[in-house]
C-alpha cells in the first residue's frame, strides 16, 4: 500500500509540474503572439508603400507559383508516400530482427541456465577446483576466439581504409600537380599578354609624340613660309604701283608729242626718263616673276608634304584603331583564362574538402576501432545468472542511451543550422567592411598628375581645368573619371569572392550533413565518448565495490563458519532489488526527458506554423517587388535597349559610335571639335557601362528576393521534419512507458517469487521506511531538475526567437536600402539620359 501511495503522490507531483509548465508555456505563447501582432502591425505600415509598385507582376507570379506549388505538392506527396513505405518496410524488418534477437537471447539464457545448474551440482558434489579450471579455460578460449575474430576484422578494415587513403592521396597529388602546371601556364600567358600590351602602348605613345612633333614643326615652317610669302607679295605690289606710274608718264609724253603747242625741250627729258624707266623696270619685273614662281613651287611642295603628312596621320590613326582592337581581343582572350583559373581553384578547394572529410572519417574509424578493442578487453564471460542479467540490462541501457543521443543530435543539428546562418551573415558583413575600407583608401589617395595631350604634344603641367583639350586614349583611364574599369573589375572580383565563400560554406554544410547521415547509417546511432568513459568508470567502480564486498563476506564466512549458500542467495536478492530500483529511476528520468522533448517539439512546431502563416499573410498582402526593367538582349548595347524602351527608335547607338570615331579621326575639324567628339564617345561608353552595372544590381536584388522565398520554403520543410520528429518521439515515449511497465512487472514478480521469507528477514521495517524516504527524495530531486531544465530550454527558445526576429528586421532594412539605391540609380540614369539627349540636340 505504501508503494502505491508513493506512486500516486509521484504521479500527482508530475501532473502538477506538467500543468505548471503548460501554463507557463501558454503565457509565453500569448506574449509571443502579442509581440508578433505588434510586429505585423508595424510591418503592415511599411508594406502599404510597397504595394503600389508590384501589382502588375503579382498576377503572373501567382499563376506561376500556383503551377509550381501544384507540381511541388504532387512531388512531395509522392516522396512522402515512398518514404512512408520505406520506413514501414524498415520498421517491419527491424521488428523481425529484434524478435529474432530476443529468441536467440532467450535460447542462450536457457542454455546458460542449464550449464550453470550442472556446474552448481558439480560444485555441491565437491569438485570446485576442477570446475573453476574448466570455466577459466573455456572463458579464456572464448575470449581469445572473439578477440581474434575482432582483430582480423579490424585489420581488414584498416587495410581497406589505408588503400582507399592512398588512392585518394595519389589522385589528389595528380590533381594538384595538374592544377600547378595549368596555373603556371596561365601565369606565363598572362605575363606575356601584359608585356605585349605595355610594349604596344609604349610604341603608340612614342609614335604619337613623334607625329605631333613633326606636325608642330611643319606648322611652324608653314607659318614662316606664309610670312615670307606675305612680304614678297607686298614687294610685288609696290613694283606693280611703280610700273603703273611709269605707264601713266609714258602716256602723257605721247599725248604731248601729238599736241604741237608743247615745248620741245621737255621731250628729250621725258623720253630719257621713259627709257630709263623701261630699262630699269624690266629686270625688276623679271626678278619678281622669278620669285613668285619660286614661291609657288615652294607652296606646291609644302602642300604636297602636308598631304603626305595627312595621309600618314590617317594611316597611323588606322593603325592605332587596329592596335586598340587587338588589345580588346587580347582582353577578351584573357577573360576565359581567368574563368578557367577560377574553376580550377574551385575544383582544388573541393578536392581539399573531400580529403579533409576522408581524413576525419578515417580518424573516426580508428577511434571506433580503439574503442572496440577496449570493449573486447573489458567484455568477460558471465560467471553466474546475476552477471548475465546484469549484462542484458546494460545492453538495454546502452540501447536507450543511443536513442537519447540520436534525439539530442537532431536538436544539435537544428541549432547548427542557425549558427551557420549567423556565420554566413558575419562573413558577408566582413566583406562589406573590407570593400568600404578599400574605397576609403582609394578616395584618400592624392590625384596623380594628369598627362594631357594637346595639339603640340603632351603637357604634364596642365591644370585639371584643361580637360577640354584632352584627346588621348589614356586620359580616359586616369583617376579623374568617376569609375574606372579597374574599379569595376575589383568590385566584380570582390562580389565573386563573397559568392564563392557563401557557396563554399553551403557546400561544407551539406557535406557535413551527408557525412553525419552516413555515420548514423553505418554505426546505427551516434556515440558519445564522454558518456561512455563515465559509464565505464562507474561500472569499474561498482565491480571493485562488489569484489571487495565478496571478499569481506568470504572472510566473515571463514571466520564465523556460517552457511555459504544462504548468504549468496541473500546477497543476490539484494543486488537484484537494487538494480531494479535503479532501472526504474533511470526509466522515469528518461520518461520525463522524453515528455519534455515532445513538448519542446510541439512548441517549436506551433512557432513554425505561426511563422508560416505570417509569411503567407505577408505575401498575400504585400506583393513582390517589381523593378520595371527591360532585359538586355545579347549583342545589343544597353543604351540602345533603353532608347527603344523609351520610344526613341531613330537613334542607333552603334552607328552613332562609328560616326563619332570617324569624326574624331577627321582632320578637317578643329581641335576643339575633335576633343568634343572624343569626349562624347567616352561619355557614351561610360553610360553603357553604368547601364550594365544597374542591370547587374537589379538582377542581384531579384536573386535576393528569390533567396527569401527559398527561406520561406525551408521554414515549411522544417515544419514537416519537426512533425515527423514529433511522431518519432511520441513513439519512443510510448515504448519507454511500455518498458517501464515491464520492469515494474519484473520487479513485482521477483519480489513475489524469490523474496518470500528471506526478503522479510533481509529487510526490516526501518530499512523499508528508509528506502521509501530515499525514493521520495530522489523523485523530488528529479522533479526540481526537470523544472530547471524546462526553464533553461524555454530561455534558449526565447533567445533563438529573438535572434530570428532580429534577422528578419535586418533583412527588411537591407531590402529597403536596396530599394532606395535602385531609386537613386534610376534618377541618376534619367538625368544622364536627358543630359545626353540635350547634348546631341545641341551638337547636331
UniProtKB/Swiss-Prot annotation:
Q: Which family does it belong to?
A: Belongs to the JAKMIP family.
Instruction: List the coiled-coil residues.
Output: 8-259, 289-421, 493-621, 688-833
Gene of origin? Jakmip3
* Residue ranges with Basic and acidic residues bias: 254-267
Which Gene Ontology terms of cellular component type are present? Golgi apparatus
This chain belongs to the protein called: Janus kinase and microtubule-interacting protein 3
Organism, by scientific name, is Mus musculus (Mouse)
- Specify whether Coiled coil is a keyword of the entry: yes
Modified positions (Phosphoserine) are 384
Cross-referenced Pfam families = JAKMIP_CC3
Residue ranges with Polar residues bias: 466-483
Subcellular location, in the record's words? Answer: Golgi apparatus
Q: Which PANTHER family match?
A: GOLGIN SUBFAMILY A MEMBER 4-LIKE ISOFORM X1 (PTHR18935), JANUS KINASE AND MICROTUBULE-INTERACTING PROTEIN 3 (PTHR18935:SF9)
Report the principal subcellular site. Answer: Golgi
Enumerate the InterPro entries for this protein.
JAKMIP, JAKMIP_C
Keywords for the protein's UniProt record, in alphabetical order? Coiled coil, Golgi apparatus, Phosphoprotein
Where is the segment annotated Disordered?
249-290, 466-488
Specify residue ranges for compositional bias: Low complexity: 270-282
Any one GO MF annotation of this record: microtubule binding
Amino acid at each position: 500500500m505504501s508503494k502505491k501511495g508513493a506512486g500516486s503522490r509521484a504521479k500527482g507531483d508530475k501532473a502538477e509540474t506538467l500543468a505548471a509548465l503548460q501554463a507557463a508555456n501558454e503565457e509565453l505563447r500569448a506574449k509571443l503572439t502579442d509581440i508578433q501582432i505588434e510586429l505585423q502591425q508595424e510591418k503592415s505600415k511599411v508594406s502599404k508603400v510597397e504595394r503600389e509598385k508590384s501589382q502588375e507582376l503579382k498576377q503572373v507570379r501567382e499563376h506561376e507559383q500556383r503551377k509550381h506549388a501544384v507540381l511541388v505538392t504532387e512531388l512531395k506527396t509522392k516522396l512522402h508516400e515512398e518514404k512512408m513505405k520505406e520506413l514501414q518496410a524498415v520498421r517491419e524488418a527491424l521488428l523481425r530482427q529484434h524478435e529474432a534477437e530476443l529468441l536467440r537471447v532467450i535460447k542462450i539464457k536457457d542454455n546458460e541456465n542449464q550449464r550453470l545448474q550442472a556446474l552448481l551440482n558439480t560444485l555441491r558434489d565437491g569438485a570446485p577446483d576442477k570446475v573453476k579450471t574448466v570455466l577459466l579455460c573455456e572463458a579464456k578460449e572464448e575470449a581469445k576466439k572473439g578477440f581474434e575474430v575482432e582483430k582480423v576484422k579490424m585489420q581488414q578494415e584498416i587495410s581497406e581504409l589505408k588503400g582507399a587513403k592512398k588512392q585518394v592521396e595519389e589522385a589528389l597529388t595528380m590533381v594538384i600537380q595538374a592544377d600547378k602546371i595549368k596555373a603556371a601556364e596561365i601565369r606565363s600567358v598572362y605575363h606575356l599578354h601584359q608585356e605585349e600590351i605595355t610594349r604596344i602602348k609604349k610604341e603608340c605613345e612614342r609614335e604619337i609624340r613623334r607625329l605631333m612633333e613633326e606636325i608642330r614643326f611643319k606648322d611652324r615652317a608653314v607659318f614662316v613660309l606664309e610670312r615670307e610669302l606675305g612680304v614678297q607679295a607686298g614687294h610685288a605690289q609696290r613694283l606693280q604701283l611703280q610700273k603703273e606710274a611709269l605707264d601713266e608718264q609714258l602716256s602723257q609724253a605721247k599725248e604731248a608729242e601729238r599736241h604741237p603747242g608743247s615745248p620741245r625741250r621737255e621731250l628729250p627729258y621725258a623720253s630719257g626718263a621713259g627709257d630709263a624707266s623701261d630699262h630699269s623696270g624690266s629686270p625688276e619685273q623679271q626678278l619678281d616673276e622669278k620669285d613668285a614662281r619660286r614661291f609657288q613651287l615652294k607652296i606646291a611642295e609644302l602642300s604636297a608634304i602636308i598631304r603626305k603628312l595627312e595621309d600618314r596621320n590617317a594611316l597611323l590613326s588606322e593603325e592605332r584603331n587596329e592596335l586598340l582592337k587587338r588589345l580588346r581581343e587580347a582582353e577578351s582572350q584573357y577573360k576565359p583564362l581567368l574563368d578557367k583559373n577560377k574553376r580550377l581553384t574551385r575544383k582544388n578547394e573541393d578536392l581539399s574538402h573531400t580529403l579533409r572529410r576522408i581524413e576525419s572519417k578515417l580518424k573516426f574509424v580508428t577511434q571506433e576501432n580503439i574503442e572496440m578493442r577496449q570493449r573486447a578487453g573489458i567484455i568477460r564471460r558471465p560467471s553466474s545468472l546475476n552477471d548475465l542479467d546484469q549484462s542484458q540490462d546494460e545492453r538495454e541501457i546502452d540501447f536507450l542511451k543511443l536513442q537519447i543521443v540520436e534525439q539530442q543530435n537532431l536538436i544539435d543539428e537544428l541549432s547548427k543550422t542557425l549558427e551557420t546562418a549567423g556565420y554566413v551573415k558575419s562573413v558577408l558583413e566582413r566583406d562589406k567592411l573590407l570593400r568600404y575600407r578599400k574605397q576609403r583608401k582609394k578616395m584618400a589617395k592624392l590625384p596623380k598628375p594628369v598627362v594631357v595631350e594637346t595639339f603640340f604634344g603632351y603637357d604634364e603641367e596642365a591644370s585639371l581645368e584643361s580637360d577640354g583639350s584632352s584627346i588621348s586614349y589614356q586620359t580616359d583611364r586616369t583617376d579623374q573619371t568617376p569609375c574606372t574599369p579597374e574599379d569595376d573589375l575589383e568590385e566584380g572580383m570582390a562580389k565573386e569572392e563573397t559568392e564563392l565563400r557563401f557557396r563554399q560554406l553551403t557546400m561544407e554544410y551539406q557535406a557535413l550533413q551527408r557525412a553525419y547521415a552516413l555515420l548514423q547509417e553505418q554505426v546505427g546511432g551516434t556515440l558519445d565518448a564522454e558518456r561512455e568513459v563515465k559509464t565505464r568508470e562507474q561500472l569499474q567502480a561498482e565491480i571493485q565495490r562488489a569484489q571487495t564486498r565478496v571478499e569481506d563476506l568470504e572472510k566473515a564466512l571463514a571466520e564465523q563458519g556460517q552457511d555459504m549458500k544462504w548468504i549468496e542467495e541473500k546477497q543476490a536478492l539484494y543486488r537484484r532489488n537494487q538494480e531494479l530500483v535503479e532501472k526504474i529511476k533511470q526509466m522515469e528520468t528518461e520518461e520525463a526527458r522524453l515528455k519534455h522533448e515532445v513538448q519542446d517539439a510541439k512548441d517549436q512546431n506551433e512557432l513554425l506554423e505561426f511563422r508560416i502563416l505570417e509569411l503567407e499573410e505577408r505575401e498575400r498582402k504585400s506583393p513582390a517587388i517589381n523593378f520595371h526593367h527591360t532585359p538586355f538582349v545579347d549583342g545589343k548595347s544597353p543604351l540602345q535597349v533603353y532608347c527603344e524602351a523609351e520610344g526613341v527608335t531613330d537613334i542607333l547607338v552603334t552607328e552613332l559610335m562609328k560616326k563619332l570615331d570617324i569624326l574624331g579621326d577627321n582632320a578637317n575639324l578643329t581641335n576643339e571639335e575633335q576633343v568634343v567628339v572624343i569626349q562624347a564617345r567616352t561619355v557614351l561608353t561610360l553610360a553603357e557601362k553604368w547601364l550594365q552595372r544597374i542591370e547587374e544590381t537589379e538582377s542581384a536584388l531579384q536573386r535576393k528576393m528569390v533567396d527569401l522565398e527559398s527561406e520561406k520554403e525551408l521554414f515549411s520543410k522544417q515544419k514537416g521534419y519537426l512533425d515527423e520528429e514529433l511522431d518519432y518521439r511520441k513513439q519512443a515515449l510510448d515504448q519507454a512507458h511500455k518498458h517501464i511497465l515491464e520492469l515494474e512487472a519484473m520487479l513485482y514478480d521477483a519480489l513475489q517469487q524469490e523474496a518470500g521469507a528471506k526478503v522479510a528477514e533481509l529487510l526490516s521495517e526501518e530499512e523499508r521506511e528508509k528506502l521509501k524516504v530515499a525514493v521520495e527524495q530522489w523523485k523530488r530531486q528529479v522533479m526540481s531538475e526537470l523544472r530547471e531544465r524546462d526553464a533553461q530550454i524555454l530561455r534558449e527558445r526565447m533567445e533563438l526567437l529573438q535572434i530570428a526576429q532580429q534577422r528578419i528586421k535586418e533583412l527588411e532594412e537591407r531590402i529597403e536600402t536596396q530599394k532606395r539605391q535602385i531609386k537613386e540609380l534610376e534618377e541618376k540614369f534619367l538625368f544622364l539620359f536627358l543630359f545626353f539627349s540635350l547634348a546631341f540636340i545641341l551638337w547636331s
